[in-house]
From Swiss-Prot:
GO MF assignments: translation elongation factor activity
Transmembrane segments: none
Coiled-coil boundaries: none
Protein name as catalogued: Elongation factor P-like protein
Short name of any one Pfam family annotated for the protein: EFP_N
Length: 189
C-alpha cells in the first residue's frame, strides 16, 4: 500500500469501500515546525461520478487498485455519448460528455495516443497524450518585424480551445500543445 505522498493523478484509490479516481492533488506544506505536509486530493467516484475531496498526511497509507489501460481511437459522437474504438480488438467504449468535458478541448478526429482507463471491465476515464498537434484556425496576422521574443497573442483551434502563442505564428500552422497545462510547446514537425 502506497503512502499519500506517492499517489499520482489518474490513479484509482479504494477509500471506505468506494473506488475513487484521483483528479487533482494539492500539496500544502505548513510553516510550523513538526507539522506534516498535507495532500489535498480531489476524487471522482468511479461508479457514480460524484466529486469528493479529502486531505491526507504524507505518511497516511492508501489502498490503490490496478487500472487496465487500452489504446483507443476517437470514433464518433452519439448524442451525449462519445464512442471510442479499441485499437486491438475493435470493441467500442462509451463515455458521457460530462465525464470527459476537460478533454473535449483536445479531441479531434486525427488525435493519436488516447487511452481509456478501466477497472473490472468498466470504463472509468479517458487519458490524453501529453502533447497533441492542432491547427490554428484563428489568430491575428503575424507582424512583419515580429521576433521570436516572448510576446504572445491568442490563437483559437477547431475544438474551441484558445491559448497564447508566439506572435510570429499564422493562421493554418500546426502547433504542439501540452494537454495538462494547456500551453504552446512549439511548431509541429
Amino acid at each position: 500500500m502506497p503512502r499519500a505522498s506517492e499517489i499520482k493523478k489518474g490513479e484509482v484509490v479504494d477509500l471506505n469501500g468506494q473506488l475513487l479516481i484521483v483528479k487533482d492533488i494539492e500539496v500544502h506544506s505548513p510553516s510550523a515546525r513538526g507539522a506534516a505536509t498535507l495532500y489535498k486530493m480531489r476524487f471522482s467516484n468511479v461508479r457514480t461520478g460524484l466529486k469528493y475531496e479529502e486531505s491526507f498526511k504524507g505518511d497516511d497509507m492508501l489502498s490503490t487498485t490496478q487500472l487496465e489501460r487500452r489504446q483507443v481511437a476517437f470514433s464518433y459522437i452519439d448524442g451525449d455519448d462519445y464512442v471510442f474504438m479499441d485499437n486491438e480488438d475493435f470493441s467500442q467504449y462509451m463515455l458521457k460528455k460530462n465525464d470527459i468535458e476537460d478533454q473535449l478541448l483536445f479531441l479531434t478526429e486525427e488525435i493519436q495516443g488516447l487511452q481509456v482507463l478501466m477497472v473490472d471491465g468498466q470504463v472509468l476515464a479517458l487519458e490524453l497524450p501529453q502533447t497533441v498537434e492542432m491547427e490554428v484556425i484563428e489568430t491575428t496576422p503575424a507582424m512583419k518585424a515580429a521576433s521570436a521574443s516572448a510576446r504572445t497573442k491568442p490563437a483559437k483551434f477547431v475544438t474551441g480551445l484558445t491559448i497564447q502563442v508566439p506572435e510570429y505564428l499564422e493562421q493554418g500552422e500546426r502547433v504542439k500543445i501540452h494537454t495538462a497545462e494547456k500551453r504552446f510547446m512549439g511548431r509541429a514537425d
